[in-house]
Amino acid sequence: MPHSHGLDPNDPSGRRAFLGKLAATAAAGAAGLTLTSALDPEVLSAATIGAAPDAEHWLDNLKAKHKQLVDAYEPNDGWPLGFSHTFLATQSAAAPGNSVIVLRHFAMPLALDHSLWARYKIGEAFKVTDPATKQPAVKNPFYKPAKGVLLADDMSIDRLIARGAFIGACNIALNVLSGMLASNAGVSKEAAAKEWTAGIIPGITILPSGTWGVNRAQEKGCTYCTGGG
């Protein structure tokens, strides 16, 4: 039965839980985040959501017999990418599969290119460790990493895209999280949102929301796999 895990920032109860978790992160002192930096009602307004990108044709080429969605709502040390890789790797040559990854909630920054990670202190804020340095990541550790850094080279975002994986990033999380970290880069929330939008890795589609993407993938016949975390 189709289902989903994690917090949904788009319904009222899910929104409260989502912002509550942001507050908990702030209380822990992650990169100086504060609750007030997260509470921007405009981000979750109907007007903002309604102006989100049109991605209805995102999955038009999702035509394999075997299709799986990985719902990534936490970075979880890159395991959502690993799940996509193992699903693709275990299909037969006669019946290859399609993999869909939705990067939403706190996993959304995995969709950003290297240039934004140090500038916004993303690794420090969301406790993403670079497996090469064992320190908070100052670049996206899952995008074009050196050979042998990841558990499997083919789980990197660039290689998954090259293998035909469909990857989408939540526009709601993009706006919420860029606003939270805007002060790290010394810019306004509006400027941060524009920079994050421009910094999406080529081949990744910005979705109206992550839950929208989870829904569309399942409507297209994908089985569901949680990204964990």
Language-model features and meaning:
Residues G78-A94:
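Histidine-anchored nucleotide/phosphate-binding helix
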Residues A182-G229:
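Glycine-rich, aromatic-bearing surface loops/beta-hairpins
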Residues K65, A95-S99, A162-G168, K220-T223:
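Loop/turn elements at helix/coil->beta-strand transitions in domains of secreted/extracellular proteins
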